[in-house]
Amino acid sequence: PTARAEALWPEVRAALAQLRAAFDPGEFQPQLEPASFRLTMSDAISTTLMPQMVSQIESIGAQTNLRVVPPATLNPRAMLERDEVDVAVGHFPDTVASIGVEGRAATLRHRRLYDSQYVCVMRRGHPLAGRALTLDAYCEAHHLLVSFSGSPFGLVDETLGALGRTRRIVLTVNQYYTAGRVVARSDLLTVLPAFFVEATGRRADLVEQPLPFELAGIHVEMIWHLRHDRTSAHRWLRERLVEAAAAALGEVPAAGPEDV
């Protein structure tokens, strides 16, 4: 395609989406209407939500298929803009902040599914497991970082830098399951959202400790493009994700029908 065609495609795609929405037959009937959706989320979030999603689909005999792919970056905007995925689920603070700044002109929408706090995770029997974790002890230890990009610098390192401290990242991995297995069999420390520890599959082998510094909480959001905002099938999908989070975690933050 020419550069001109590529430049026009987002506008054409948006117009087509509006046309589809205009002819949307109304309430989606999952038992009668085959549908496939692509979602992007980490393995930890998938472990939390997908068992509940599959249970919902199977229990009502829905002709619905889900395709889950890993996030390429910490900002899913490009995947959503290019219509590569229908929904992104994860902790995307920069994306959510930009949606707020854009206001009515925003092309993305979001809704919070659940909240969590970060904890320091180590193997059971680790020398630091039996006592309060100090900042000095934390910084002197060796660390594992879950990094989708492979960069050995994350939110914790930014926070430590503000305190004039650093840590050594011995290993970066891109899966929480892998992180749990490595930490359970080494003296490495890692920092995970508390809800994600279960996704490592090694909870019985791990110990959680409060962090020796302040770290903002994690907010797991689902984000979708405006083109799918009012399509009945996509609304049905998002409602199922909200229910899956409620069933898996026991609580969904109070909010309007689809937030902002």
Each model region followed by its residue ranges:
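Central regulatory/effector-binding core of bacterial HTH transcription factors
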Residues: 34-97, 173
